[in-house]
From Swiss-Prot:
Zn(2+) 2 binds at C859, C862, H881, C885. It comes from Mus musculus (Mouse). InterPro entries: Ankyrin-MYND_domain-protein, Ankyrin_rpt, Ankyrin_rpt-contain_sf, MORN, Znf_MYND. MORN repeats lie at residues 16-38, 39-59, 61-83. The lineage of its organism: Eukaryota, Metazoa, Chordata, Craniata, Vertebrata. Residues 391-400 have a biased composition (Polar residues). ANK repeats lie at residues 282-311, 479-508, 511-540, 547-579, 623-657, 660-689, 701-732. PROSITE patterns: ANK_REP_REGION (PS50297), ANK_REPEAT (PS50088), ZF_MYND_1 (PS01360), ZF_MYND_2 (PS50865). GO terms for molecular function: zinc ion binding. PANTHER family: ANKYRIN REPEAT AND MYND DOMAIN PROTEIN 1 (PTHR15897), ANKYRIN REPEAT AND MYND DOMAIN-CONTAINING PROTEIN 1 (PTHR15897:SF2). Gene3D superfamilies: Ankyrin repeat-containing domain, Histone H3 K4-specific methyltransferase SET7/9 N-terminal domain. Pfam families: Ank_2 (PF12796), Ank_4 (PF13637), MORN (PF02493), zf-MYND (PF01753). SMART domains: ANK, MORN. Keywords: ANK repeat, Metal-binding, Repeat, Zinc, Zinc-finger. This is Ankyrin repeat and MYND domain-containing protein 1.
Length: 906
């Protein structure tokens, strides 16, 4: 067995002199070939491993090796002094130290900076080890003898190294690997001792991670510093000689891929002059350059020559994600309530000389809103035409901008009178017959414009874009610009489909977000369908700093029919329809009225008796928003929101979870969407679900001042009737809190509590209010009176099920404590009899329904009802109590006689 330092030669003329270990070249040594070539450096089991110098007749290579191949940073020097510098893989440059000026960078997309919250990972220095002791339940492929394969002593026969040195076909035990590494790094710091934090991963492509790990392993070698390896890793080429041929060809190939020079690239790859996976110092590859410029033939060529379709840039972006970012610009994203985005300002229209197409920029926004059919059956959606139309102005028309704004509507206004509004502010505006006029005033002039419909322009652009070649004109009009944008967009879509068909992973890149998020945010139904068919995952989320939203959260908030279609697509794949966002601390519509103290005084009132309502046996789950919460929160398109809610409920979304104190039902009430309310109630939403954060129940939300602008009083009354018809109990207890005082009441008390928060309308004399304030006062009063009526009917319904005689005696005994029966008898017997017949009843004003903050007084004749004021007493007497009181008074002698007989019975 060869061990130690020595020399060994072969009859072929090859020779090695250096360190041996277990019959292998292992350690420092020099290997020479008959042609004069030599390698001086580190060997590992008879293979070049680590830093070394390779001498040939035509060049000198200094760099890192692994398993007998170049693998990492290196410098190849030629006789003329030029050098190829970068990261090497075998005989090819894999990454340059120079940057292509036109390379892709997220710096050019500042709108996504908020999504760049993920920090770079560090190198994992520990080798993967299989843990022992996996149980049969944890390991689906468990069998009894499997653990023997995990034992170093049982992997190889004893003394295997004595009669075989073929380690390339034998398993490497952990103990042998540790022994070999100790021999290589005998006089140095062990490679994986954490004397410092591991390096940050500069590029997460698996091959480049392995290269960086190999470089880190040999970082303490002298060559690492003397050969300027850190400068290569940083992409700093200033300390090296002029670029060599391989470096020049590699850089030129990236630029040729942008230009679309297929023949030149094919010749380079055919002659093996460069690697199809080469990238600049920032990881911008040839494939990315070709894909960004939609050169499909070059993309296919590179993939045929082995380019990695999922290779990432240093920013972590794959070619597929670059294409998606280009296909879905920020302006194509729909504003939605899931992300709390705001509507953008309407763009301004342009005035062209002599003929003013009012489409101009409004035409661009139209393409964002609707899909335009293009050749091949695809659709043009969410187009980024602003950039392409930015240069459409000629020098003569560059100063002819309207001052008025044109809203992006679906049809073009034909009202010519609106043109004069902006003309007064633009003294240089052109007229139909004059371009060079320069009067001080244009009030006497009129610009007679020709309004061309969008349909005509779109059809013209569609026909023009279908031509095989477009003639070049020095000035391109709106139609040609639109046609050019259609062609570019179609090519980008074809590039995306090609990359996905050739194996691009839509889940790999998470910077700035997954591709599925981009398609959903843009409302592209076909894009979402393509990604889902390509295996895009749906259980993805935004970072916690952005509320951890899922694609379903955004899909259910999209306006229009595309939101319904995308939601349906996602629900066919998604696993957790009740995924929660990280916004559990968000306060939904915390208006000023919530901050004002109510003038209603709380005196620890007990609320309705327990026999008057049914108690909830479970505590509702509370957390972040679910997709159902988002859909019920929508105020934009009530019909589409209803359809989305129906889809979610059909996939078993839970309608009885809380967010910000609200249930989906209360959110639908607060947002004013009665269609969603009806859908939720019909699908089993609980109208009596107790809400948190002082919201009470769904009936309480109807009369909350914060949401009173969502519907008229008639609609609120109809909503109350609908809730009650689906089982809403107006007698459910509601706890009111103000400071250190609490009280328990009903939805009526909650309504009056909120009513008295607006002190001006609640307490000012009616004649002192403005007309609008009077309308508000009357509307609130009418709603509360109707709710009080429903409360009285509910109480009377409960009391009708009780013993009328016992109920009357209980009320009379409690409300008139000084009352005594006229007949003689034992007072103790009568007291015991009254206690036996005592029935709890609800003390509230039978006219307005209030039980909190009022002083109740019974009817002095019958003690059958309670009222809180003279106004309520008079109104109750007129409306309903006059007849009831007379009926009760007629029954009193009979009731008292019955009570006496009961008291006398043994």
């Amino acid at each position: 067995m060869k061990l130690g330092y020595g020399e060994f030669s072969w009859p072929t003329g090859e020779a090695y002199h250096g360190q041996f270990y277990r019959d292998h070249f292992h350690g420092l040594g020099t290997y020479t070939w008959p042609d004069g070539s030599s390698f001086t450096g580190t060997f590992y089991l008879s293979q070049r491993e680590g830093y070394g110098t390779m001498h040939t007749k035509t060049m000198l290579f200094q760099g890192l090796y692994k398993e007998d191949q170049r693998f990492g940073p290196g410098i190849e020097t030629y006789p003329d002094g030029s050098q190829d510098v970068g990261l090497w893989f075998r005989e090819y440059l894999l990454k340059l130290c120079t940057r292509v000026p036109s390379g892709f960078s997220l710096v050019n997309y500042p709108e996504f900076l908020a999504f760049l919250t993920k920090s770079r990972r560090r190198l994992d220095l520990s080798d993967e080890k299989v843990e022992l002791g996996l149980s049969e339940e944890q390991d689906p492929f468990f069998y009894d003898y499997k653990q023997y394969l995990l034992n170093d002593e049982l992997k190889l026969p004893p003394e295997m190294h004595v009669y075989s040195t073929d380690n390339s076909h034998l398993p490497m035990t952990d103990s042998l690997r540790q022994e070999l590494d100790d021999h290589i790094f005998m006089n140095e710091i062990p490679p994986f001792i954490e004397d410092e934090e591991p390096w940050l991963i500069t590029n997460e492509t698996p091959l480049l991670v392995k290269i960086q790990k190999q470089t880190y392993k040999f970082r303490n070698k002298d060559a690492h510093t003397s050969w300027n390896i850190p400068a290569i890793l940083e992409g700093n080429r200033s300390r090296f000689g002029p670029s060599g041929p391989k470096e020049q060809i590699s850089k030129k190939m990236i630029m040729k891929a942008e230009e679309g020079d297929y023949n030149w690239i094919f010749g380079i790859l055919r002659d093996n002059l460069a690697c199809a996976d080469v990238a600049d110092s920032k990881g911008y590859t040839v494939l990315a350059a070709a894909a960004m410029h939609s050169h499909l033939d070059i993309v296919n060529l590179l993939l045929d020559f082995g380019a990695d379709v999922n290779k990432r840039s240093d920013e972590g972006i794959t070619p597929l994600s670059m294409c998606f970012l280009q296909y879905y610009p920020c302006k194509s994203f729909h504003p939605n309530i899931a992300e709390r985005t705001l509507l953008q300002e309407s763009p301004k229209s342009l005035v062209t000389p002599k003929i003013s197409f009012l489409l101009a920029d409004a035409n661009i926004d139209y393409l964002y809103d609707v899909g335009m059919p293009i050749a091949g059956g695809d659709e043009l959606k969410t187009s980024s035409l602003d950039d392409s139309l930015a240069s459409m102005q000629t020098p003569e028309s560059s100063n002819m901008l309207h001052k008025e704004e044109v809203s992006p509507v679906k049809t073009v206004s034909t009202d010519v009178e609106k043109e004069s509004e902006g003309a007064a502010e633009n003294v240089d505006a052109s007229t139909l017959y004059s371009v060079d006029t320069n009067f001080e005033s244009t009030k006497c002039l009129r610009n007679y414009t020709i309004n061309v419909s969008r349909d005509i322009m779109e059809k013209s652009a569609q026909a023009y874009s279908s031509l095989p070649q477009h003639p070049c004109f020095p000035y391109k009009g709106t139609v040609r610009k639109m046609a050019q944008s259609m062609v570019e967009r179609r090519n980008r879509w074809m590039t995306i489909t090609l990359l996905l068909r050739r194996g691009a992973d839509p889940n790999l890149c998470q910077v700035p977000m997954q591709a599925l998020f981009l398609a959903v945010k843009a409302g592209d139904v076909e894009g979402v369908r393509l990604l889902l068919m390509s295996g895009a995952q749906t259980d993805i989320q935004f970072p916690p700093q952005l509320q951890s939203l899922t694609p379903l959260h955004i899909a259910v908030s999209l306006p229009g029919e595309e939101g319904v279609k995308i939601t349906e697509l996602l629900l066919h794949v998604i696993t957790n329809v009740d995924a929660k966002a990280a916004d559990e601390d968000y306060v939904y519509k915390g208006g000023k009225a919530d901050l004002l103290p109510s003038s209603l005084k709380l005196n620890n009132e007990p609320g309705p008796p327990k026999s008057f309502y049914s108690t909830h046996t479970f505590i509702p789950e509370e957390g972040g928003r679910t997709a159902l919460h988002v859909a019920c929160e929508r105020e934009d398109n009530k019909k589409c929101a209803r359809d989305i809610v129906r889809l979610l409920l059909s996939h078993r979304a839970n309608p009885n979870v809380l967010w910000s104190g609200h249930s989906p039902l209360s959110l639908a009430i607060a947002s004013g969407n009665d269609l969603v309310v009806k859908e939720l109630l019909s699908q089993g939403a609980d109208p009596n679900l107790p809400l948190t954060k002082g919201l009470g129940t769904a009936l309480c939300v109807v009369c909350d001042l914060v949401y009173e602008q969502q519907r008229s009083v008639e609609n609120k009354i109809a909503l109350i009737d609908r809730l009650i018809s689906y089982g809403a109990d107006v007698l459910n207890p509601v706890t009111l809190v103000q400071g250190d005082r609490t009280a328990v009441g009903t939805a009526v008390d909650y309504g009056y509590f909120k009513f008295f928060q607006d002190r001006k309308i609640a307490h000012c004399p009616f004649h002192a209010l403005m007309p609008a304030e009077r309308e508000v006062f009357m509307a609130r009063k009418r709603l509360l009176e109707y709710l009080g009526l429903q409360l009285r009917l509910a109480v009377l319904s409960k009391e009708s099920r009780l013993d009328t005689k016992a109920l009357y005696l209980s009320k009379r005994a409690e409300l008139a404590p000084c009352h005594r029966l006229k007949k003689k008898g034992s007072s103790s017997v009568r007291t015991q009899s009254s206690e036996k017949q005592s029935i709890p009843f609800y003390k509230f004003c039978y006219q307005c329904g209030r039980s909190i903050g009022v002083r109740l007084s019974p009817c002095p004749r019958c003690y059958g009802i309670l009222t809180c004021s003279k106004y309520c007493k008079t109104k109750a007497w007129i409306e309903f109590h006059k007849k009831d009181c007379n009926d009760i008074m007629a029954m009193i002698p009979h009731l008292e006689g019955s009570a006496w007989r009961v008291a006398e019975s043994p």
